[in-house]
Amino acid sequence: FEVEMRSIEKVSWKGRERLGQLTGVGSEDFFHELLPKLMALGQAEITALRLNQMAIAFEIAVRQPGYYGFFHIAYLPDHHRHSPGKQLMLHNIERAMNEGCTEFDFMQGGHDYKQKFCTGTRGLMDAFLCQRSLAGRLNHWLSRIFTRRRAN
């Protein structure tokens, strides 16, 4: 399924705008090491919307008792007209409610499609820890530049 997910994301709007979680730099450790462990513990899941056995949309979620964390979604642009991402998201919202979840968290990213459904927002803060050394100071300096660029 990983090949299908990467293919979907690569051609999706997130892939074109380089906002993808699967195709970005540094995603290998998450998807090959952490995600399988979280899934084995029941703390993450992947759902897919299929048409004639072919995945046209997928969603990755973080799961805890009473909590559904909407981590990532992507869909094939050829099916945009039928809103496969929205259909999958709505299916998972309904499923989470039926399973007794009291919180559906859209997590990071204030995308328009999330704003249509959310009832509130939380502020996020980045933390960057560095060792006390020349390399640590350099890392701290670089992180400040990156943070300023991202804010602009």
Q: Each predicted region: which residue ranges?
A:
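Active-site/acyl-donor-binding loops of N-acyltransferases
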Residues: 51, 65, 101-152
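Short, high-confidence coil segments that cap the C-terminus of an alpha-helix
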Residues: 43-44, 98-101
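A short, structure-level motif marking secondary-structure boundaries and short turns
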Residues: 19-20, 76-79, 94-96, 139, ...
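Short glycine/serine- and small hydrophobic-enriched flexible loop segments
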Residues: 33-36, 91-97
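Conserved acetyl-CoA-binding loop-helix of GNAT-fold acetyltransferases
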Residues: 81-94
